[in-house]
Regions:
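Short S/T/G/P-rich N-terminal loop/turn motif that feeds into the first structured element of a domain
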Residues: 1-54, 63-73, 89, 96-107
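N-terminal nucleotide/polyanion-binding subdomain common to many enzyme families
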Residues: 81
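Nudix hydrolase/Nudix homology domain
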Residues: 84-86, 94
Length: 107
């Protein structure tokens, strides 16, 4: 069963332009390098007024839990995680199944 994996990222300081570019480059490489996801999006809040310090959001979808677990173990994801740790990032993750109880509006 398909699922969504959503992660919010809070950094203790504003990222430099180079760091933002690094983050985007890493995540942009995943569809080809990792390949397991069916959707991948990365963005920032429009105003920052309500995000409580979580300045970036990663949205991914996977066909099943096994694919998500394989993604988590992939070296490209581990490198990204290490990059986050080096910057003392506080992630907030949420995973849920996409089923008749959670999909309230079909695409």
């Amino acid at each position: 069963m398909a699922l969504q994996h959503i992660v919010l990222f809070s950094f203790p300081r504003e990222l430099s332009d180079d760091e933002v570019a690094q983050m985007w480059e890493m995540v942009e490489s995943w569809p080809k390098e990792i390949g397991l996801m069916t959707r991948c999006r990365l963005g920032t809040d429009l105003t920052g007024a309500r995000n409580r310090g979580y300045g970036y959001l990663l949205y991914t979808e996977f066909p099943d839990i096994d694919a998500m677990n394989e993604y988590r173990a992939h070296p490209a994801h581990i490198r990204f995680n290490d990059w986050l740790v080096e910057r003392d990032c506080t992630p907030l993750a949420f995973d849920y199944l996409l089923d008749e109880h959670t999909v309230l509006m079909a695409e």
